[in-house]
């Protein structure tokens, strides 16, 4: 498994939390998102993230790693999906 997957998993967890708290604005702007990640202490190989390192760790993921991470992300929103379904199917 790719060594970057844990860092990307942490990044996805942060994105998930921001989305759940309606702060998509932070996630949608890459520079702001990277600044936010740095502020909360997310690092790659002991260094703060920047545009290049962010792009690099994501691009080095295998297709299998990406699928695993997407499945984990969607699983985290399962409760939200059920909630929305409950209120939209009245």
Curated annotation (Swiss-Prot):
The keyword Lipid biosynthesis does not apply. GO terms for biological process: regulation of DNA-templated transcription. Pfam families: AsiA. Keywords: Transcription, Transcription regulation. The keyword Ribosomal protein does not apply. InterPro entries: AsiA, AsiA_sf. Interacts with the host sigma factor RpoD, and thereby inhibits its interaction with the catalytic core of the host RNA polymerase. Transcriptional inhibitor. Inhibits sigma 70-directed transcription by weakening its interaction with the core of the host's RNA polymerase. This allows Gp55 to successfully compete for the core enzyme. Plays an important role during the prereplicative period of phage T4 development. This is 10 kDa anti-sigma factor. It comes from Enterobacteria phage T4 (Bacteriophage T4). The lineage of its organism: Viruses, Duplodnaviria, Heunggongvirae, Uroviricota, Caudoviricetes. The gene is asiA.
């Amino acid at each position: 498994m790719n060594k970057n997957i844990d860092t990307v998993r942490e990044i996805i967890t942060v994105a998930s939390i921001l989305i759940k708290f309606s702060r998509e604005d932070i996630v949608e702007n890459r520079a702001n998102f990277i600044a936010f990640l740095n502020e909360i202490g997310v690092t790659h190989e002991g260094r703060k993230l920047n545009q290049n390192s962010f792009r690099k760790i994501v691009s080095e993921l295998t297709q299998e790693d990406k699928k695993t991470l997407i499945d984990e992300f969607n699983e985290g929103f399962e409760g939200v999906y059920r909630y929305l379904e409950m209120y939209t199917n009245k």
